Amino acid sequence: MLTIAMPKGRIFEEAVELLRRADYALPPEFTESRKLVIDVPEENMRFILAKPMDVVTYVEHGVADLGIAGKDVLMEEERDVYELLDLHISRCHLAVAGMPGAKMNEIAPRVATKYPNIASTYFREQGEQVEIIRLNGSIELAPLIGLADRIVDIVSTGRTLRENGLVELERIAEVTSRLIVNPASYRLNGGDIERLVDRLAAVIPQP
């Protein structure tokens, strides 16, 4: 049985649709269940539903053979997992944003984000010295209350930025969801995993 860790929310819904297009017989109530572990014996699969940042932890430690995670999470966490396939779902991008025309702190601008590793790497590569402030939610609030000069966050439509009077300043990276695998599981279950990859690859939406 292959165990697949999946994040709750939008990625989960799009991933389930992709699996169904690949002719995996997931029951109709699959997306409505409140269970965190769901067995699908007809397909010899088990699904673990988790927070996005936890998916890579489950895969890295081998409690899940495979996982579906956003490229943003993979960039931030840098875990010991293999990236098998770009699923081309949940498309968005990482960006730097801030108040239009706002003056930056000249010594070390403060940047609020839930992606401290990505932000640190990006600004270091840009030759900018910044102070990173880690937040877990409502990142857009930071410039509005004077906590930070800029933010680094995921942008999908840009609506949240606009509604809070912020503008996108720089684009860091494109983000889609990826199929990842535990290295040991890949060696032990390579045949089953490759069949899954082939079936998904055949139905992936093209960019």
Swiss-Prot record:
Q: Where in the cell is it found?
A: Cytoplasm
Extract one GO BP annotation from the record.
Answer: L-histidine biosynthetic process
Instruction: Using the UniProt record, give the first listed, main subcellular location.
Output: cytoplasm
Q: Name one Pfam family in it.
A: HisG
Which chemical reaction does it catalyze? 1-(5-phospho-beta-D-ribosyl)-ATP + diphosphate = 5-phospho-alpha-D-ribose 1-diphosphate + ATP
Q: Name one GO cellular component term.
A: cytoplasm
Q: Do you know which CDD domains this protein is assigned to? A: PBP2_HisGs
Q: In which pathway does it act?
A: Amino-acid biosynthesis; L-histidine biosynthesis; L-histidine from 5-phospho-alpha-D-ribose 1-diphosphate: step 1/9
Select a single GO molecular function from the record's annotations and give it. ATP phosphoribosyltransferase activity
Query: In which domain of life is the source organism classified?
Result: Bacteria
Q: What class of enzyme is it?
A: transferase
Transmembrane stretches, by residue range?
none
UniProt keyword annotations, A-Z: Amino-acid biosynthesis, ATP-binding, Cytoplasm, Glycosyltransferase, Histidine biosynthesis, Nucleotide-binding, Transferase
Instruction: List its EC numbers.
Output: 2.4.2.17
What NCBIfam families has UniProt attached to this entry?
Answer: hisG
- Family per record: Belongs to the ATP phosphoribosyltransferase family. Short subfamily.
The job of this chain, per UniProt, is described as:
Catalyzes the condensation of ATP and 5-phosphoribose 1-diphosphate to form N'-(5'-phosphoribosyl)-ATP (PR-ATP). Has a crucial role in the pathway because the rate of histidine biosynthesis seems to be controlled primarily by regulation of HisG enzymatic activity.
Subunit structure, briefly? Heteromultimer composed of HisG and HisZ subunits.
Query: How are the domains described in the entry?
Result: Lacks the C-terminal regulatory region which is replaced by HisZ.
What is the name listed in the Swiss-Prot or TrEMBL entry for this protein?
ATP phosphoribosyltransferase
Source organism of the structure? Geobacillus kaustophilus (strain HTA426)
Upper lineage ranks? Bacteria, Bacillati, Bacillota, Bacilli, Bacillales
> What's the encoding gene here?
hisG
